[in-house]
Amino acid sequence: MTTFDKGAKPDIGTFVAFDHVRFVVGNAKQAAYWYCANFGFEPFAYKGLETGSRITAQHAIRQDKIVFIFESALLPDNSELGNHLVQHGDGVKDVCFEVEDLDSIIAHAKAAGATIVHDITEESDADGSIRYATLRTYGETDHTLLERKNYRGAFLPGFKAHPMPATFFKTLPRVGLNFLDHCVGNQPDLQMDSAVQWYEKVLKFHRFWSVDDSMIHTEYSALRSIVVTNFEETIKMPINEPATSDKKAISQIQEYVDYYGGSGVQHIALNTSDIITAIEALRARGCEFLSIPSSYYDNLKERLAASSMVVKEDMDRLQKLHILVDFDENGYLLQIFSKPCQDRPTLFLEIIQRQNHEGFGAGNFKALFESIELEQTKRGNLFYDNVKDGNTK
């Protein structure tokens, strides 16, 4: 595991934080409801036929500082969203960052050769105005850069209060997720470095953390990962790629690439200050998470006993809930991973709690990979010999 110095502050505008994540899905209304019922969000903003939007419907849901938007086409001839859906299935299209001084950021991005999907645009309503531009990053994933200092509304121009009452969702156990911790992008083999260089060159992000396949591997598969972040280190974007296996096994990263149809967002990590309460609530709501064997916790207890680190959470409850623990001399983190959120084995969510620990669970990667490999085996996707032309032998 390697960490990096962030260097001098870039001479362009500021990347403030994650603003929201936009998904392209087959049915935005149903997807929004599913995430609300399962993961503790509540509907809060809407754009569709009733608000004057004739092309797409967008349902925005929120939990504390986390905002997801689900977008679907309204008309059958919408080839942009239609083609995206056929190629990738339900998935993340846009990871939006709030920024300050949009002009300088976009001027630099253009000079660096970035693909500009939408140049700087201003939109307004009775609550003020926003300015934004959209860049293409890896695959067909975009980053919208949003300047909202002159906007006083609840979300964005054109959105109205969501018509779906939150009464039912308020009867379910409260989850308590607080903010978006990091957003992970998977790349085909040997494309991680070019994706990382895009963030360094176009957005002036810096490398924060990395691991390679000598550290992260199982008997069957491995990965390499580099985390990039803005100068303030409020936006963290891990970039993964698979490592080749001599056992003809399919890495979980490669499985994602195969089923998503290329590079894309693999998972979104949501931060909580009380992961035990959060996971108990999520399981009560029906969320499914990866299972971790008891041997992992036996080994964890031995490693903790040989260290000076004290985990204040009850280990028996962590084990019962299948929550993973990683630690170093400074602190620890607790994390758990959902099963895929759609039929394709692509996007999933991570729930994470940090106690003075800024890593990404490198000590848990082996246990996580082995758990995912069990799921791949159930899907018939662990070995190339079992898969041919999309069909399981």
From Swiss-Prot:
A Gene Ontology cellular-component term: Golgi membrane
Record note on disruption phenotype: RNAi-mediated knockdown together with fah-1 RNAi rescues the impaired growth and fertility defects in the single fah-1 RNAi mutant.
CDD domains referenced in this protein's UniProt entry, alphabetically: HPPD_C_like, HPPD_N_like
Catalytic reactions on record: 3-(4-hydroxyphenyl)pyruvate + O2 = homogentisate + CO2
Alphabetically ordered keywords of this record: Dioxygenase, Iron, Metal-binding, Oxidoreductase, Phenylalanine catabolism, Repeat, Tyrosine catabolism
Gene that produces this protein: hpd-1
NCBIfam families xrefs: 4HPPD
Recorded GO MF terms: 4-hydroxyphenylpyruvate dioxygenase activity; metal ion binding
Residue span, VOC domain: 17-148, 179-339
Pfam families in UniProt: Glyoxalase
Protein task: Key enzyme in the degradation of tyrosine.
Enzyme Commission no: 1.13.11.27
Pathway as given in its UniProt record: Amino-acid degradation; L-phenylalanine degradation; acetoacetate and fumarate from L-phenylalanine: step 3/6
Alphabetized Gene3D superfamilies for the sequence: 2,3-Dihydroxybiphenyl 1,2-Dioxygenase, domain 1
Cofactor: how and how many bound: Binds 1 Fe cation per subunit.
Expression sites (tissue/organ): Expressed in the hypodermis and intestine.
Cofactor(s) the protein requires to work: Fe cation
One GO BP: L-phenylalanine catabolic process
Name of the protein in question: 4-hydroxyphenylpyruvate dioxygenase
UniProt-annotated binding residues for Fe cation: 182, 267, 350
Protein family: Belongs to the 4HPPD family.
